[in-house]
Amino acid sequence: MEKHDGIKFNYLCPFNEPDGHWNWIGPKQEGTPATNREIARAIRLISKEFVNNQIDTQILVNESSDYRCMFDTHMTNWERGYQIQSFFNPDSTATYLGDTPNVPRLMVGHSYWTNTPLNNLHDIRCQLKDTLDKYKVDFWQTETCIMGNDEEIGGGGGYDFTMKTALYVARIIHHDIVYAGARSWQWWRSIGGDYKDGLIREYSDPTFLNGEVKDSKLMWALGNYSRFIRPGAVRKAIIAKDNQGKIIPEGDTDVTGLMCSAYQNTDGKEVFVMINYAAEDKEFTFYQRNGIIKNWKIYRTSDKDGENLLPVGSIKNHEKVVIPARSIITLVTQ
């Protein structure tokens, strides 16, 4: 395809949700129910062909349907579970791919089914990160949308244009990055119908020859991250303190209040994303440790009409910031 159409694939993942038992029944899903041994054998063969043909495309091992299958088994058996250990522990001689050409030390997975109850949102990602770190493997979150078990926002059925879904998804992004260590984060699809899986809602006429589209707060909320955090950025530590100056353990994450994360882009610009999940305004005082950066521009997304990454002013270090209820702000260095 690169020679014929000029389209280069940097990455190729041959196996989608091999552990997703629910994918294997009916015509509407795309699961490929291969075992870890079958996946390892196929990837070694693909790697060999890539080397022989001087193709530098990187091969991703598989896209897991559930984080729990990456470090354990969940509604499947050992043949499709323990994926990190199977592919990147040298003791797993039948399935080890850590020294296979064109295969990065990278696992990819989908965050479906692990976002509720709230303790799962935290604990499952911590277990995933512990296993990834043990075997020195990176992680990408490569697909998710709202599903039936996301009951806090009414499940996946029925499109939602409001901050209810936008904040719920932003909380998932925060946990995938902060606790699972995701270096890439991807949503299921851009445009959809009457289901919470598209960033944009489409309305087609009966002939499918005409129609219209309408954006959602979810689309803009993702922009609070993707518009400002650029490829190659690194995440920076955040320390939260109370009014008496005492450090708050995991103070960057209150699942029903404020959640914040910070980043530095390759051009040196710094980015700070703050989610206010609460039903009331919150305030905080912002300190940038080295004090070099003096001014931050603020962009806000909320349920107000027109507040879609809207520039709403700027602040200086040590100034108090008010973040309105049920909103997301991004601070960017000027």
Give the location of each predicted region.
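Conserved beta-strand positions
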Residues: 14-17, 61-62, 109, 141, ...
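Noncatalytic carbohydrate-binding groove/subsite architecture in carbohydrate-active enzymes
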Residues: 29-172, 179
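C-terminal beta-strand-rich structural cap/linker in extracellular carbohydrate-active enzymes
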Residues: 311-334
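Aromatic/acidic polysaccharide-binding cleft in carbohydrate-active enzymes
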Residues: 138-249
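Carbohydrate-binding surface patches
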Residues: 245-294, 326
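Solvent-exposed beta-hairpin/edge-strand motifs
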Residues: 289-308
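Conserved, mostly hydrophobic/aromatic
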Residues: 12, 107, 176, 185, ...
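Active-site groove signature of glycoside hydrolases
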Residues: 1-28, 102-105, 110-111
